[in-house]
Curated annotation (Swiss-Prot):
Involved in repair of UV radiation-induced DNA damage. Catalyzes the light-dependent monomerization (300-600 nm) of cyclobutyl pyrimidine dimers (in cis-syn configuration), which are formed between adjacent bases on the same DNA strand upon exposure to ultraviolet radiation. The lineage of its organism: Eukaryota, Metazoa, Chordata, Craniata, Vertebrata. GO terms for molecular function: deoxyribodipyrimidine photo-lyase activity; DNA binding. PROSITE patterns: DNA_PHOTOLYASES_2_1, DNA_PHOTOLYASES_2_2, PHR_CRY_ALPHA_BETA. Keywords: Chromophore, DNA damage, DNA repair, DNA-binding, FAD, Flavoprotein, Lyase. Residues 378-386, 452-453 are annotated as: Interaction with DNA. Its EC number is 4.1.99.3. FAD binds at residues 478-480. This is Deoxyribodipyrimidine photo-lyase. Residues 43-65 are annotated as: Disordered.
Length: 556
């Protein structure tokens, strides 16, 4: 990015921040202007009222009187994007997968093969593809290859993804970018599609997982030799291959590397604007209802009502996080009874929301520095550590991928007596003796998510209640991939591997079944939060579900 471009963005950002701060000071009772006019007694009462610990465990009051109206975030972001227009993509963010790097002459356009990053704006891969197309004065196309089934993903995840893609297609139309939905494996369809449309280059996303890597290799093998094939990491703030060239042992070994590179990569993201070069041929229209009905996936796991698919839904959730929950994150993120989390993982997983955009906007909040630091540790360091693990460890989802000490201790205790043994079906249906575990599982079933603290407890109990570590890991991954909106993701695999196999952790005091793997139990959870309150909430979920089932049966 040029120095002139950076200076322009900084000046614009400073102006925008000053303007928003002045607006806030007029009507926000939490600002210094208002605060100084309050009496000492009022200030004392205000501190007591807003203290997270003052409510006897109740949800703390959120900031009141914010000057920002609904939709402020999108308006602010659009201004920032436009101010960054013309800024180049950092070349370290991309790599050529083909032997040739020369753009094929006599082409009819450029193709961005969208896969992991399913959004138009804040997408470095699409930005780079558009910059190539602009340089050659050619049309820009986007395609997405829809496989009818993927691992243990269900209708829940597919519907969320496809409704987000429908939003992508609509935005593409408004920008004069052609959107194509191809059906089937990329390796079978993409190379011939490229030849048919005479594309001069193909740009695609980065994904460290096994099947997407196989797709890349197959496409690379069958693409015309004179068509450049370029991969751009638009999912990570620091590109995976730049953060580290090897498998990192844990957060402490990668944190410094990522932090050192953030100033280079955590830049403002330019706008994807209307493309000035129209295609002579239009993409085939997509019948989205037909696409949804043609899926070969399990449909008993339905959609959830709390998560609006698409980038617009993700931006709305980000806005609510910044306004309502961010300041609670540092102190209350490990308490499942508090609404202190971002809830952004479904949109970040599907790429409907850019992690870099999230970081940029959260960092602008100057009154929640502790929470901002904690959140960036989770969103950047821990999440990108998960990509590192999956990219450099082919056995990221099985016991073979564990550290030697962990494999040995699990093997040493594999035959230990278990007080309880449950089948996969019993676990999926929350039929255990542990009401906290059952409540967490019901949350996953009903909401497509589970509180982060309970994910650890949940997976560790599966290790304790199944016949072997291999079976425990298999069931944990199956349930997460099947039920969670952010399933089939590096974060999910690493979360299960951390809980069951000690990945990115150390050995602890040896005990039955777990060996030296970190132990968690019910009593420990009771010391952390009001377990009974959480259990009551999801017992009610079970009762409501049973009532709905009875009503449905009576109607039939």
């Amino acid at each position: 990015m040029s120095g002139e471009c950076m200076l322009h963005i900084r000046l614009f950002s400073t102006n925008l921040y000053i303007r928003s701060t002045l607006l806030r000071s007029v009507s926000d009772p939490n600002t210094l202007l208002h605060y100084c006019s309050m009496s000492a007694n009022k200030r004392k009462l205000k501190r007591q009222r807003e203290s997270p610990d003052s409510g006897g465990g109740k949800q703390p009051r959120l900031a009141e009187g914010r000057a920002r109206e609904s939709g402020w975030l999108l308006r602010e972001v659009n201004e920032l994007r436009r101010a960054a227009q013309g800024c180049e993509v950092n070349k370290k963010r991309l790599r050529y997968l083909s032997d040739t790097q020369k753009i094929k002459q006599g082409s009819d356009g450029f193709l961005y093969w969208m896969s992991r990053d399913q959004r138009v704006q804040d997408n470095w891969a699409l930005i780079y593809a558009q910059q190539l197309a602009l340089a050659e004065k050619l049309p820009l196309h986007i395609c997405f290859c829809l496989v009818p089934r993927y691992l243990d993903a269900t209708y829940r995840q597919y519907a969320f993804m496809l409704k987000g893609l429908q939003e992508v297609a609509k935005e593409c139309k408004s920008l004069d970018i052609q959107f194509h939905l191809l059906s089937g494996e990329p390796g079978q369809n993409l190379p011939s599609f490229v030849e048919k449309w005479k594309f001069g280059a193909v740009v695609t996303d980065f994904n460290p997982l096994r099947i997407p890597l196989q797709w890349i290799e197959t496409v690379k093998k069958h693409l015309p030799a004179d068509v450049p094939f370029i991969q751009v990491d638009a999912h990570n703030v620091v590109p995976c291959w730049e953060a580290s060239g090897k498998l990192e042992y844990g957060a402490r070994t990668i944190r410094g590397k990522i932090t050192k590179l953030l100033p280079e990569f955590l830049t403002e993201i330019p706008l994807v604007d209307t493309h000035p070069h129209s295609a002579s041929r239009a993409a085939e229209p997509v019948d989205w209802e037909e696409v949804l009905s043609s899926l070969e996936v399990e449909r008993s796991v339905g959609e959830v009502d709390w998560a609006q698919p698409g980038t617009s839904g993700g931006m709305n959730m980000l806005e609510s996080f910044i306004d309502q929950r961010l300041r609670l994150f540092a102190t209350h993120r490990n308490n499942p009874n508090y609404d202190a989390l971002s809830h952004l993982s479904p949109w970040i997983h599907t790429g409907q929301l850019s992690a870099q955009r999230v970081v940029k906007q959260v960092k602008r909040e100057k009154n929640a520095s502790e929470s901002v630091a904690s959140f960036i540790e989770e969103l950047v360091v821990r999440r990108e550590l998960a990509d590192n693990f999956c990219f450099y460890n082919p056995s990221y989802d099985n016991i073979s991928g564990a550290y030697d000490w962990a494999k040995k201790t699990l093997q040493d205790h594999a035959k230990d007596s278990r007080q309880y043994l449950y089948t996969k079906e019993q676990l999926e249906n929350a039929k255990t003796h542990d009401q906290l575990w059952n409540a967490a599982q019901r949350q996953l079933v009903s909401e497509g998510k589970m509180h982060g603290f309970l994910r650890m407890y949940w997976a560790k109990k599966i290790l304790e209640w199944t016949a072997s570590p291999e079976e425990a890991l298999s069931i944990a991954i199956y349930l997460n991939d099947r039920l969670s909106l952010d399933g089939c993701d590096p974060n999910g695999y690493v979360g299960c591997m951390w809980s069951i196999c000690g990945i990115h952790d150390q050995g602890w005091a040896e005990r039955p079944i777990f060996g030296k793997i970190r132990f968690m139990n019910y009593a420990g959870c009771k010391r952390k939060f009001d377990v009974a309150q959480f259990e009551r909430k999801y017992t009610a979920v079970k009762e409501n579900s049973n009532k709905d089932s009875k009503k449905s049966s009576s109607k039939n």
